[in-house]
Regions:
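Flexible low-complexity loop/turn motifs enriched in small/helix-breaking residues
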Residues: 20-115, 120-123
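Short beta-strand edge/turn micro-motifs at domain boundaries
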Residues: 125-147
Length: 147
């Protein structure tokens, strides 16, 4: 093969290799969150999924944290005692008392570098999420933490 042909073939391979990466989008999907819906006579899976979306949106604001699992806390969490307690918490956005509550516990991993209140590169388990709504309305995050 003469030098011109070798150069032309090499150049063509180089150009095609460079163009091959153009237009590619990041196809890596976010990690799947393991969901345990448990058994409920109060809430449908659709009700729970709506609450889960609120939780996932909140965790998405926690830079570097990765949500691993959520587990429904059971129908007993929607007790009159808990409704009274949670309605007693001051929420700026709350315009009327909540009539329903739902509880989830979660596991998540903190960022590799220490940020906010979380220890660096640590798996946290059992963080509770309390959400409330009025008469089947939209779920609102009332509080989260360890209880």
């Amino acid at each position: 093969m003469d030098m011109k042909k070798l150069l032309a073939v090499s150049l063509t391979i180089m150009i095609l290799g460079t163009l091959g990466g153009c237009g590619k989008q990041d196809t890596q999907e976010p990690p799947k969150v393991k969901i345990d819906y448990g058994n409920s006579e109060l809430y449908t899976q659709e009700d729970m999924d709506a609450a889960i979306q609120v939780i996932e949106a909140e965790v998405a604001t926690w830079e570097g944290c990765e949500l691993h699992s959520l587990a429904y806390g059971g129908d007993a969490a929607c007790s009159d005692e808990n409704i009274e307690w949670l309605n007693g918490l001051e929420m700026k956005e709350q315009t009327e008392p909540f009539t329903q509550y739902i509880l989830f516990s979660s596991s998540f991993h903190s960022p590799v570098e220490q940020r906010d209140a979380w220890d660096a590169d640590t798996e946290y388990e059992g963080l509770q999420w309390w959400l409330g709504r009025s008469d089947g309305g939209a779920w609102e995050l009332v509080t989260c933490g360890y209880g």
